[in-house]
């Protein structure tokens, strides 16, 4: 199955070792330095719900994971570089042993206010695609794994079509979306997802932190056709 088919069918495509080792190492070293120099325990809720190392977001070591890496060619093939924008990257860390036992992961889609993520209620802050770049190995379940619900992008599409535009002002939907898959990843692996794919991070019962950087990508005219893209999920895509 090629990545086009995997993305359309399952809602995500996994590219093992796609990121050059030099870029992954530079990003990891920058994150480690920032944690050592700037970590503030009083900001832990912000780190967990928005981003670790906020001062590092948008910096060359982080942005190079997207802009100087092969994933950018895939984004271009899928959406067209001239048609999209992107954010400064979210530095996401699941600390080792952050939970005492394995618990089933709970899905979400981005862009809904949680009271902790800095978003205002009454609107969906959707985007178009998500790129995850993994900087530490994730070799078994419940190790902070990026977790997906394959095919759930179509379930959410059907939900929005049935619910109608009032869903734009409502809390995050929670339809039945099937079984979760916890992805195992090596350093430099990349996962490219449709925005509407249900996903989360599993708890980390492993001995090492899980470090990843996520980039949100959006069609430049998304604000004008946000509802259209929620109910016709391949609108604007080239694949």
Residue spans of the language-model regions?
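Short catalytic/ligand-binding loop motif for oxyanion handling, primarily in non-cytosolic enzymes
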Residues: 24-25, 94-95, 100, 140-142, ...
